[in-house]
Amino acid sequence: MVEARHLPMERGLGKTDRIDDWWKSPLAMGIYLGIAVMYATWRGFMEADFWIFEEFGRSAGNQTMAIESNGSHVLSPLFSPLVVPGQDGLGSWVPESLWWMSPAMFILIIPAGFRGTCYYYRKAYYRSFMVSPAACAVSTPFGDYKGESRLFLFQNIHRYFMYLAVAYLFVLSYDVLLATQFHATGSATSYGVSVGTLVLMMNVIMLGGYTLGCHSFRHAIGGIRNRFRNGGGAVAEACWKSCTKLNKNHGNWAIYSLFWVMFSDFYIYACTEGWWTDLVLLGGL
């Protein structure tokens, strides 16, 4: 019987025989994810009605969730679908007693849950924040890497968040449609395209590439099959191959789509604050 032998490796945080700059990637990813989380948290709470957040957003008489100039409606993806307790639409399902909560608090669990349990992001924050494993052939501060066990088995909920994330793409696509409609008091609806419309459209494309290239989605549409048979098999195979192509660059889609979500929100925030102007490129009022 062959006995497995482990190669000798120095013990201690960051100890390794590697001579390359292995730490640059987890450090850069840690900074990137940290900035994204802090920004999304700040913007999400900005529209809340308690504590210091009363000085911003709705509480201060401002509205930074959507561009409403020139008769348009360009809603930030951080607040979509818009849920305002006690008001029309989805807000009618929420008790009015929760008026103090930011609309983002009701919906961000879906994208946050999907990304937080994503296979790529799990690798990223395990390395960047938990340093376990820090990198290949790099020692950890907590002994040998044991893999995802015990509490971390909860990460398997990712496959269920995937279905919600796919549905979320339709919601964001509807927001793009609304962003092409311009309304004026007492007149019919006209159509057009602004820079904000294109920003939201690109956001859907980026999120589509990330979501539809997800490992769980790839498994759901084809990974569970031993072979593709007749009677829809050709269509299923084509979908699976397309998903596989996206999956090959899943890490890039994860990084760039997250950036674009934050940029989309910042663009809308900047326009509502008067720093930028949402130019109408085609049609409009």
Predicted feature residues:
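Membrane-embedded alpha-helical bundles that constitute the cytochrome b-like, heme-associated redox core
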Residues: 1-285
